[in-house]
């Protein structure tokens, strides 16, 4: 079944790819203008899980943006795994630079 990217809310999910690959997807849902972004920062393999670190960015108040409804998303392709895929939203720029001791 097809995935509906035009959702009005944020979501995270995994899609099957070709052969031995999968796609990790993070979406922001429907936004009223351009300038909203999604960035998958790191995909970290841990002993029992794959952790996906991502962040959202909103346009600055004075930023010139596209005046159109947008559906920001990001995706990465990784090798298929039986490990659980976990998602961690990074709220602050330096949060992921302190090392990869991620608390989930």
Q: Predicted regions span which residues?
A:
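Exposed, flexible binding/inhibitory loops of compact, secreted disulfide-stabilized domains
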Residues: 1-104
